[in-house]
C-alpha cells in the first residue's frame, strides 16, 4: 500500500512540475528558433532572398 501511494505522489509531483519546466523553456526555444526580421509578409514568396519564410501568424519573415 505504501509503494502505490509513493508512486501516486511521485506522479503528481512530475505532473505539476513538468508544465512549469515547459513554460519556462518554451519562450527560450521560440526565441532561438524564430528570429524575426524587420520585413513583413503576406505571401509565402515575400521573404525570398531576405529571411527564409513567412510566419503567417505574425505576418513577419523568419529565418
From Swiss-Prot:
Residues 1-23 form the signal peptide. It comes from the Eukaryota. Keywords: Disulfide bond, Knottin, Signal, Virulence. Residues 24-35 form a propeptide. Disulfide bonds join 37-51, 41-54, 47-61. The keyword Disulfide bond applies. Transmembrane segments: none annotated. The presence of a 'disulfide through disulfide knot' structurally defines this protein as a knottin. This necrosis-inducing peptide induces a hypersensitive response on Cf-9 tomato genotypes. Race-specific elicitors are compounds which only induce defense responses in genotypes of host plants which are resistant to the pathogenic race that produces the elicitor, but not in susceptible genotypes. This is Race-specific elicitor A9. It comes from Passalora fulva (Tomato leaf mold). The lineage of its organism: Eukaryota, Fungi, Dikarya, Ascomycota, Pezizomycotina. The gene is AVR9.
Amino acid at each position: 500500500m505504501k509503494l502505490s501511494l509513493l508512486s501516486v505522489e511521485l506522479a503528481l509531483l512530475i505532473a505539476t512540475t513538468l508544465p512549469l519546466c515547459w513554460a519556462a523553456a518554451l519562450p527560450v526555444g521560440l526565441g532561438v528558433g524564430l528570429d524575426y526580421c524587420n520585413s513583413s509578409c503576406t505571401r509565402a514568396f515575400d521573404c525570398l532572398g531576405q529571411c527564409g519564410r513567412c510566419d503567417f501568424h505574425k505576418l513577419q519573415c523568419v529565418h
